Structures are given as structure tokens and as C-alpha cells.
Curated annotation (Swiss-Prot):
The gene is fhs. CDD domains: FTHFS. It catalyses: (6S)-5,6,7,8-tetrahydrofolate + formate + ATP = (6R)-10-formyltetrahydrofolate + ADP + phosphate. GO terms for biological process: tetrahydrofolate interconversion. It comes from the Bacteria. The keyword tRNA processing does not apply. Pathway: One-carbon metabolism; tetrahydrofolate interconversion. Pfam families: FTHFS. SUPFAM superfamilies: P-loop containing nucleoside triphosphate hydrolases (SSF52540). This is Formate--tetrahydrofolate ligase. Keywords: ATP-binding, Ligase, Nucleotide-binding, One-carbon metabolism. The keyword ATP-binding applies.
Length: 551
């Protein structure tokens, strides 16, 4: 059966019953239909925090490696083992759903449901973010049109518009055409909604007041004297925040095995910080003995950003890290072409395992216990599985092979046991670089300790920006690296575990509301395009409302 068929064949429990499993009362949730709900915060009484398990992965193939599937399967396995566990996941972006991925709610018998709703419009959070973002864009252009009291320079507006769609044609636009009554002409463009700073702000805010403070700090551009102008200067922070008053509340759903899952926020890890909301993770920590969460793409992206950007705000470090690896991805990193990934090749697998070992070493830099989860595919041979298990065992790291796609939580019981054991070990969290280190120090530490590179090289533009940032005190904010997810380098074609390479930073983007500076490397894009055969071509809906083509 296909993922969507498995999902549709499962009878879901009422969301009130799922809420009751973790002690949430009727007045603490706002149902959206029968199987989804918003959680009203703060919870009535503070509860002790449970254990936190972060799931990340190696560098993926373009098809993805089933990290979300393993997260769901692990959560179900922990619940089967008698440990009350709550998942904390990111919300899928409609762009990749209609583009390459076709869905992002796990797979097989390890899914969060209702998968159609979650993958499509869900509870409207993405739309609220899009409207709030574009309302701010309209207010900026209206201010310029209506006298421009702040003396905003139309050539230096940094707030682009957004859509939750992959649309390369909108990357660069010209607006304000049509005469004096149609605005001031200027160059503009669109990003995808999950790249919006508002998404990062929402995911890092601790409550509604913090959200408004962060919104007011957002940089929108510069004035004619090259001085920064913020949302607070425009005096519209309250209006933007009120558009997000419901979106800030975490969403409660369930797994196929009727265990609770909180889904909230969805920044990409290659162009943003790649973690679900602090509020969702904090809520899960209060509701469960264990919280299993994930960070986008590999440990070099989402994993690093969880540790360096989210953890300081969350106020809790992971008790264990799970790195998901697949045999096909390691063969891909070992030089096998995509068309040949289902053919047994132990030698390429062993060569590609250097990528996994690099990620293990990277996460060990933080002083947190690491467990490797092999997400087994039907094409994987016994010889390949044994070879990979031996590679990991040789470096004294616990490893478990999972079959969660086929078996749900039952396929991750060994992994669950090893994760529980790991969380009982001492965790000595260590920062990658000193607190308040300058941007160059942080980027160099990430390049050397996480990527395995040698140095960071700045473009002429990036060097000029650093000098400007120093004037305003932005040069000591945390850095958020925007980099390809397919390689440890900034070149998607350099697979495996390259060494002594250079990371090239072409420009910086201050995200003052989120509290970090994005360093854009290589040719990473903030508005993706659709592939030659978008997943949307295979989607349909029957007269009775049955959806097909999501996966």
C-alpha cells in the first residue's frame, strides 16, 4: 500500500482523546475539526521537563532519507515500551509538497495524521505567516508612497514578499509600475514563506509578548543616510503580531498508533534555522517523559542550528542525538549514481560511510551521546546492513537497524532501547564557540568542527557588510549558515567527507527579530523552483473527496 492509502485506511481517534492521554483538558485545546487542535498556552500548571531526543541525519539524496519516518517510528516504539512520548515536528511547506517531496509526514506505518490535512493547509499557520509577511511589505511600500517620513531608500528595502509555493519566476521582480498612483517603482522579489524571518521569529518566540518584541526588531531596510529602519520604526509591530495570534499556538495531532504529536513551524534548514517552534518543544517536554524532535536535513545544517540557535532559547540541551543513515545515501556519497542505488555495492557503502562518521564526530563535539539509526529500505541487502553496522560499531557508537516504514513502532524497538540507554548517560553540553563570539569566529568553528573544512572566505560585499554590522553591534549575533544540504561543502556536487576545503560566503542577511545573521554561501536559493516533473502532476481528488498522489 502507498503511504496515503495506509493513512486513509486507519481510523483516527478524536483529538480530545489524544489530548487526554497527556493530561490536556478540553479547555486547553481548540479543536480544528475532529482530528486536529491548537493547544492553548501557557499550560495551567508548570510540569517537570522530560528527556529530549534530537533526530538528525547524514547528507541526504534528493529523495530524502526518511528522517521524519524514523522520528515517528521511534516515538511509537518508546510509547510501546511504556515511556510516554510526545513528538515535536515541523510543519510541511506546500512548495516542496507540490514540488519534489510530495509530502512530509513520515511514511508507511510511521506517519503523523491526518496526513492530507497536515501536508496541505493544516490549521492555516503558513497562510497566516504569508499574510502577515506580505502585509508588512504592503505597509512599507505604502509608507514610501505616502510621503516617506522615515526617508526609506527604495533601493535598500530588504523585506521581500513571500509565497508558500516554489516559483522561480518570482525570484526577481519590479514593482510599482503603472504611474504615480501605483506606487514607487523599485526592484523586489519573492522568497518562499518558510524562508521568511517571521517564520524564524514565530519559532523562536517564547510567548505573544516576546513575539511582538521580536517583530518590532525586524530590519526592513535602510534610510537615505544608510541607517537601519525596523518594524518598530514603522509602528506596525502590533498589527503584524495580531495576524499571528493563532499561528503562535502549537498544533496537536496523532500518529497512526494514536500517540500525540505536536507540529508547529517549518523553517528550512538550508536557508533558515530548520527547527520547529520553541513553544512546541517546550510543551512536548512538559507533557511527556520523552520528547522526540527533529531538525531539517543533515547534522551539518539542522543539527548544528538546533544546538547553536535553538538550544539557548529553549533552555534545554538534548539528552541524546539520533543520526539517521540509509544505505542508499551512503552509497550515493560513495560515488554510486542515483540509477544504481538499489544494486548491492558494499565497497561504495564503506567508502560513503565516511560521511556518516563525519556527522557522528560533529554531534559528539557538543558532548551529547549519539546513536545511529539505519533506516532500512527493501532494496538493502543483508550484506550491506551488516557492513554498515560493523562500520559504526568499530567507532564504538550504538547502532540499530529500523524497519519503521513496514512495521511502525514495532520496527524501532531496538532503537528505542538504545536511545533510552543513551539518555541515561551523562551529557556534558559544550558550545561550539564562545558565547557572543564574532561572526567570523563562529563561521570558522562551524566550518572546521562540523563540516571538516579549513577556512571561510568572504566576498567583497560580505566584507563590507561585516564592517557595517560592527557599527550597529550585529557582528556578535549568532550565525545561521545557508548552505546546500547535499554536501558538507558549499558545492552540492562534492559528496562524501571532503577535507580542508573553503566555505565561500557571498553575503549576509541580518535577521534582527530572530536574533541571528544568515550567511549565504554558494548558490543556495531562498525561493526554490519546481522540478521537471512536479509531484503536483500526480495528485488528484475524487468526487467523494478522496485525495490521491500525496506521499
Amino acid at each position: 500500500m502507498k503511504d496515503i492509502e495506509i493513512s486513509q485506511a486507519t481510523a483516527l481517534e478524536p483529538i480530545e482523546k489524544i489530548a487526554a492521554k497527556v493530561g490536556l483538558t478540553a479547555d486547553q485545546i481548540e479543536p480544528y475539526g475532529h482530528t486536529k487542535a491548537k493547544i492553548n498556552l501557557p499550560l495551567a500548571s508548570p510540569r517537570p521537563q522530560g528527556k529530549l531526543v534530537l533526530v538528525t541525519s547524514i547528507n541526504p539524496t534528493p529523495a530524502g532519507e526518511g528522517k521524519s519516518t524514523v522520528v515517528v517510528g521511534l516515538g511509537d516504539a518508546l510509547n510501546r515500551a511504556g515511556h510516554q512520548t510526545v513528538l515535536a515536528l515541523r510543519e510541511p511547506s506546500l512548495g516542496p509538497v507540490m514540488g519534489l517531496k510530495g509530502g512530509a509526514t513520515g511514511g508507511g506505518y510511521a506517519q503523523v495524521v491526518p496526513m492530507e490535512d497536515i501536508n496541505l493547509h493544516f490549521t492555516g499557520d503558513m497562510h497566516a505567516l504569508t499574510e502577515a509577511h506580505d502585509t508588512l511589505a504592503a505597509l512599507i511600500d505604502n509608507h514610501i508612497q505616502q510621503g516617506n517620513a522615515l526617508r526609506l531608500d527604495p533601493r535598500q528595502i530588504v523585506w521581500k514578499r513571500v509565497l508558500d509555493i516554489n516559483d522561480r519566476a518570482l525570484r526577481q521582480t519590479v514593482i510599482g509600475l503603472g504611474g504615480r498612483t501605483s506606487g514607487v517603482p523599485r526592484q523586489d522579489g519573492f522568497n518562499i514563506t518558510v524562508a521568511s524571518e517571521l517564520m524564524a521569529v514565530l519559532c523562536l518566540s517564547e510567548d505573544l509578548s516576546d513575539l511582538k518584541r521580536r517583530v518590532n526588531r525586524i530590519l526592513i531596510g535602510y534610510n537615505m543616510d544608510k541607517e537601519p529602519v525596523t518594524v518598530g520604526d514603522l509602528q506596525v509591530g502590533g498589527a503584524i503580531t495580531l495576524l499571528l495570534k493563532d499561528a503562535i499556538k502549537p498544533n496537536l495531532v496523532q500518529t497512526l498508533e494514536h500517540n500525540p504529536a505536536i507540529i508547529h513551524g517549518g523553517p528550512f534548514a538550508n536557508i533558515a534555522h530548520g527547527c520547529n517552534s520553541v513553544l512546541a518543544t517546550q510543551t512536548a517536554l512538559q507533557l511527556g517523559e520523552y520528547t522526540v524532535t527533529e531538525a531539517g536535513f543533515g547534522a551539518d545544517l539542522g543539527g548544528e542550528k538546533f544546538m547553536d540557535i535553538k538550544t539557548p532559547v529553549l533552555g534545554k540541551t538534548p539528552d541524546a542525538v539520533v543520526i539517521v543513515a540509509t544505505i542508499r545515501a551512503l552509497k550515493y556519497n560513495g560515488g554510486v549514481k542515483r540509477a544504481d542505488l538499489e544494486t548491492e555495492n558494499v565497497a561504495a557503502l564503506q567508502q560513503g560511510s565516511a560521511n556518516l562518521k563525519r556527522h557522528i564526530h560533529s554531534m559528539q563535539q557538543y558532548g551529547v551521546p549519539v546513536v545511529v539509526a539505519i533506516n532500512r529500505f527493501t532494496s538493502d541487502t543483508d550484506a550491506e546492513v551488516a557492513a554498515l553496522e560493523a562500520e559504526v560499531a568499530a567507532i564504538d557508537v550504538p547502532v540499530a537497524t529500523t524497519t519503521v516504514w513496514a512495521d511502525g513502532g514495532a520496527g524501532a524497538m531496538d532503537l528505542a532501547d538504545k536511545v533510552v540507554a543513551a539518555t541515561q548517560q551523562p551529557s556534558h553540553f559544550t558550545r561550539l564557540s564562545p558565547e557572543h563570539a564574532d561572526l567570523m569566529t563562529q563561521m570558522t568553528a562551524i566550518t572546521q568542527k562540523i563540516y571538516g573544512g579549513a577556512q571561510v572566505e568572504l566576498s567583497a560585499k560580505a566584507k563590507r557588510q561585516l564592517k557595517t554590522f560592527a557599527q550597529y553591534g550585529w557582528d556578535h549575533l549568532p550565525v545561521c549558515m545557508a548552505k546546500t544540504q547535499y554536501s558538507l561543502t558549499d558545492d552540492a556536487h562534492q559528496l562524501g567527507a571532503p577535507q580542508d576545503f573553503t566555505i565561500h560566503v557571498r553575503e549576509f542577511a541580518p535577521r534582527l527579530g530572530a536574533g541571528f545573521v544568515v550567511a549565504l554561501t554558494g548558490n543556495v536559493l531562498t525561493m526554490p523552483g519546481l522540478p521537471k516533473h512536479p509531484a503536483a502532476l500526480d495528485m488528484d481528488i475524487a468526487p467523494d473527496g478522496t485525495i490521491s498522489g500525496l506521499f
